[in-house]
From Swiss-Prot:
SUPFAM superfamilies: AF1782-like. This is Uncharacterized protein MJ0273. It comes from the Archaea. Gene3D superfamilies: AF1782-like.
Amino acid sequence: MMVRNVIKEITEEKLENYFKRTEEAIKIIKKGMPPKRSLLYDVAKDFLLMIESYFEDAKAFKERGDYVTAFASLNYAYGWIDAGVRLGIFDVGDDDVRFTLAK
């Protein structure tokens, strides 16, 4: 099977779109943190640390002109976001447009 319209590069426009989507998702999950007294609160903080670390790494890679690794870092960040949402660590309501919900 021949594949047509193969995209072989990550454009600045595409990268900016992923930065924007990830930043919006981070704002939403921060509002959906478990209560501080919950056993899940420390888990959520750990997830958030990983998410923000990958997001900051993506910024640094972009500044160096390494769009491929920046894009990969954003995808790792979003993977952590979706895992946290799907496990019920972050409450995002019924937002199944931005997040992969379990149902």
